[in-house]
Amino acid sequence: MAMTVHCDIVSAEGEIFSGLVEMVVAHGNLGDLGIAPGHAPLITNLKPGPITLTKQGGAQEVFYISGGFLEVQPNMVKVLADTVQRATDLDEAQAQEALKAAENALNLKGADFDYSAAAARLAEAAAQLRTVQQMRKGK
């Protein structure tokens, strides 16, 4: 039997996952982080993108978070997400449309253009698409 660590994924709306996992992969500020049982303690920011859980037995479950924090202790991993969705609940067509709209907004800058807001919308839409693609790859 593989070693496991307890993982909780929560947001302001509530807990979306709580259980034992063999591995957690999340998108941090400096790239992807792989967290296995016994990992050194760590707290880090998370960027928008997928979080992949490898459950007992090897089954994978993918979530999308819009950002947040990751806390790692030797026997516990906690994801505190701004917002979180199961990847299966994401609408790929809607994410592609949001990506196009954000790209258009960046190209059609007006006098009252908010570059940081447009860039954030673009990053979030791209992260949602990346999550859907990662979920498909895992199946």
From Swiss-Prot:
It holds the Pfam family ATP-synt_DE_N. InterPro entries: ATP_F1_dsu/esu_C_sf, ATP_synth_F1_dsu/esu, ATP_synth_F1_dsu/esu_N, ATP_synth_F1_esu_C, ATPsynth_dsu/esu_N. One of its GO terms (cellular component) is plasma membrane. The keyword Transferase does not apply. GO terms for molecular function: ATP binding; proton-transporting ATP synthase activity, rotational mechanism. The keyword 4Fe-4S does not apply. Keywords: ATP synthesis, Cell inner membrane, Cell membrane, CF(1), Hydrogen ion transport, Ion transport, Membrane, Transport. It is found in: Cell inner membrane. It is a peripheral membrane protein. Produces ATP from ADP in the presence of a proton gradient across the membrane. F-type ATPases have 2 components, CF(1) - the catalytic core - and CF(0) - the membrane proton channel. CF(1) has five subunits: alpha(3), beta(3), gamma(1), delta(1), epsilon(1). CF(0) has three main subunits: a, b and c. Belongs to the ATPase epsilon chain family. HAMAP family: ATP_synth_epsil_bac. This is ATP synthase epsilon chain. The gene is atpC.
